[in-house]
Regions:
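Solvent-exposed edge beta-strands and adjacent loop segments
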Residues: 3-4, 11-88, 130-144
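Generic secondary-structure microfeatures
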Residues: 63-65, 85, 90-95, 114-118
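A general structural signal for short secondary-structure junctions and capping/turn motifs
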Residues: 79, 102-104, 113-114, 142-146
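Mixed-charge, glycine-accented linear interaction segment located at domain edges/termini
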Residues: 129-177
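Oligomerization/assembly interface segments of phage tail-like spikes and tubes
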Residues: 77-96, 146-160
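Generic "edge-of-domain/loop-turn" microfeature
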Residues: 30, 66, 94-96, 119-121, ...
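Short, conserved charged micro-motifs
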Residues: 96-103, 163-165
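Short, acidic/charged, Gly/Pro-enriched secondary-structure junctions
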Residues: 102-125
Length: 177
């Protein structure tokens, strides 16, 4: 076999937390693909991998309304594997400024950095980008307990699972060059 298993997995503490705390977005075309380096699932860049003057923009998400899901799709007969990436989050309050922002996102191929509740950053849409899919802007019916805003969903497909990023690298790509 050409893909030997070289390590095992030990049982971890039961302290993992689900959900996202912060999301960052940029146009996929802002990434300089040739300058993105990784090893063992972690980006190894020590400086930004964005075009000059570009940055990731912050999206603050409410508690328990954002998640990312990676689905491993392997086809034994063809010997191929791909990794579907999905990002979902909710922005409350329907308003003109957010509607314009949402329409801009819908028109672009995007890359996202997500920060999960365990303190890990991951880069989504690294090679091929992600696009908006199946998003809605519900008004809700009741005064409380229902969403009134933008329920946004993005999907992409990548050759590897999302790479982790260090906090230092995230700080570098958040600063406008």
């Amino acid at each position: 076999m050409t893909c030997p298993i070289v390590t095992g997995v030990t049982k971890a503490c039961r302290d993992s937390k689900g959900g996202l705390t912060t999301i960052y977005v940029t146009e996929h075309s802002n990434l300089i693909q040739a300058s993105i380096t990784s090893a063992s699932g972690i980006l190894t860049n020590v400086a930004t991998f964005l075009n000059t003057g570009k940055k990731f923009w912050t999206i603050e998400v409410e508690m328990n309304v954002g998640n990312e899901i990676e689905t491993i799709n392997s086809d034994r007969p063809t010997g191929t594997t791909a990794y579907a990436q999905a990002l979902n989050f909710y922005i409350p309050k329907k308003q003109a400024s957010i509607a314009q922002w949402v329409m801009t996102l819908a028109q672009n191929d995007l890359a996202f950095i997500v920060l999960d509740k365990n303190g890990y950053y991951r880069l989504l849409g690294q090679k091929y980008g992600m696009g908006m899919t199946g998003s809605t802007a519900p008004s809700g019916t009741n005064m409380t307990g229902e969403q009134s805003g933008y329920v946004l969903s993005f999907a992409g497909e990548e050759p590897v699972l999302a790479n982790e990023m260090s906090a230092a690298l995230v700080a570098a790509v958040l600063v406008a060059a």
